[in-house]
Amino acid sequence: MLPQNSQVVHGVQDGPPVGPQPAQALLKVPVDVRRQAQAGPLAGVEPRPRLGVGAHHTPGVPVPLILGAVQHVHLLPGPRGQCLGHPLDVVHPLAQHQPLYVGPEEHPVGQGGVPLGVIGLGLDHRVPVHLARDLAKLGLYVHARAEYLHLVGPGVDPVHRAVLPAEKGPQCSVVVVVPHGCSAQTQQVRGPHRQEDPTRHGGRQLVGLIHNQEKFCGRVLGLDPPVSQRSRTRHIQVPGQGVGRRGAGCKDPRVRKEPGRRVPPLSRQHPPVCQDEGGQPQPPPQLQGHEGLAEAGRALEHAVPLGGDVAPGLLQDPFLVRSERDGAPLPGCAVSGRRFASQDPGTPGEGDVGLSPGREGKQVRFPRAGHVSIYRVEP
């Protein structure tokens, strides 16, 4: 079992690791394949003679993923039938509440490669193919082999660690997906009978959240194209009456049927807007170099609050992608973000609603189990 604040970094790539790896960031972990076989099948872990090794592995020996059961992410084919990626080995962390970050192999953007991306996974989180399809719309394509695996313990801002590969060169774009996992207390309260419903359980399958939360998301700086365009069934609120679901055979008089024309998704009805302190919509700031980045950072800070420990064991919601060295935004990058809130109002005591530090007296929703925060950094 790893310590609570342990940090494990090892490179997995075709050739030798590029650049020196800091010794203080490596933790020697004994590889016990028999113990791993009891924990879960080593699916997809095959001998690869050219596999790069870390400081705590024997050269020439395949590096098994010893952190838990291995899942797969199958990606869609690329343009002209070219496959952009292969199944990515996604593992579950050892300790509870320990996020796992898997970074795909880095390629220059625009030269037939795929952009660098970061996927944040919590305990018992799986990445189905539908989530990979939605991430592909954001420009995130995972490759066959992960460039690095990074484990951080509780109390460490995951974004500070996750965006480090973006500092290698100007040709990288980073998409940070931070799912806020569910704690053990939340699982016990909700029970196993609700674990199959992704919109009510704490993010066990994030695809349900992304597909169902389009009309609930707080738009900050819009992402184009939208993540999902599947919000076709709408809930209609009749003044003074209840809420019903529109349908062909619906006989409920409280439900008002709309005209026959197809209503476009919310993401296509109007361009994404920001809101000022008074709640009035404002156009997204024009990002031009370093001066535009600072303005975008202030707007992002107001719109997406920094949520504290809203539930035991949950990750904090970062509002800006910053560098680990000085805490400043990444230079020369445009920051855009989109926050997905949960349609489940939650149970009392989970800290859903609080006061934003950037908006005095205005109540905003803080992240909790089931929330997903997506931020994108582009050159």
UniProtKB/Swiss-Prot annotation:
Basic and acidic residues bias (residue ranges): 249-261
Renumbered residue ranges of the record's region Disordered: 1-20, 227-290, 331-371
Q: Which domain of life is it from?
A: Viruses
The biased composition feature labelled Low complexity covers 7-20
Question: What name has this protein been given in UniProt?
Answer: Uncharacterized protein 055R
